[in-house]
Amino acid sequence: MKREILLERIDKLKQLMPWYVLEYYQSKLAVPYSFTTLYEYLKEYDRFFSWVLESGISNADKISDIPLSVLENMSKKDMESFILYXRERPLLNANTTKQGVSQTTINRTLSALSSLYKYLTEEVENDQGEPYFYRNVMKKVSTKKKKETLAARAENIKQKLFLGDETEGFLTYIDQEHPQQLSNRALSSFNKNKERDLAIIALLLASGVRLSEAVNLDLRDLNLKMMVIDVTRKGGKRDSVNVAAFAKPYLENYLAIRNQRYKTEKTDTALFLTLYRGVPNRIDASSVEKMVAKYSEDFKVRVTPHKLRHTLATRLYDATKSQVLVSHQLGHASTQVTDLYTHIVNDEQKNALDSL
């Protein structure tokens, strides 16, 4: 989604919200949470507060009038009723007879509400230096996680990774083979952003950074000589991330054409740009997702930028057998998250043994 459109939608949702949600928004913007994350949270709050009005828990006329005391006095039974409502209500704007939303969607809603409740009960300060209230009902609400072993998850994910020679093969395909399949009109469009697209995909494959971390990079965050980028991790923490050497020529090619191709001024600090009506703008996450999906589907299988992160992590573990090193590269505080890659690599080793 374009940044301008995203901000417009955020403003519309903010106009609906109670004052304490607006305070929460400002606080998280300073962390900083991304606008995309805050937009998704505001959508969840809109859904929740609409239910609060519909169910009669609050007799306010509109969402913005719902008092803080409603959240303070919300019972566990009330919250469970909301979960049942979300699970059983008909799907909106969908050509299906299926009832309710997925457990993943419900968990996302509960995560957003947990964040709001934590802010109100622990993080915010009133004039006396105390939180607005202390009772956090969300701590009593359990969430159901999808039951899946690491082995099963590894099996599901490994077909969507570009391992071994496929990493370089994917980049070579975009650079050399993909253009041959295009019409003259499509080729002209492709050539306008070819260097940028290759640089972004190479960086994702060579560093394992999250999509949000990549699109938020500024020029000053890239050190080509050292092949290091400085990123803002989740929670607003700054981190220096090493980048594999194979990405360097793609980054150099992009930087060589960046200023002229995208008509930059000194104020255009974003590393990766797009032209909109002749004006350079920071590329947004949605554009990168569509780009990765298009190229990957033509090459092998449709994937997301997060699968490129998994690709780097798997290759790095295969080369080092160090979960600590992989967790540091990905910006994880614990090695538990990297257990997945040991299962994927074990499958690769089994396949190699079977071929002997």
UniProtKB/Swiss-Prot annotation:
PROSITE patterns listed in its UniProt record: CB, TYR_RECOMBINASE
Residue ranges constituting the Tyr recombinase domain according to the UniProt record: 169-354
Broad class of the protein's primary localization: cytoplasm
Keyword annotations: Cell cycle, Cell division, Chromosome partition, Cytoplasm, DNA integration, DNA recombination, DNA-binding
Gene Ontology CC terms, in alphabetical order: cytoplasm
Active site per UniProt: R210, K234, H306, R309, H332, Y341
Regulation: FtsK is required for recombination.
Core-binding (CB) domain sequence ranges: 16-121
HAMAP family, A to Z: Recomb_XerS
Family: Belongs to the 'phage' integrase family. XerS subfamily.
Protein name: Tyrosine recombinase XerS
Organism: Streptococcus pneumoniae serotype 19F (strain G54)
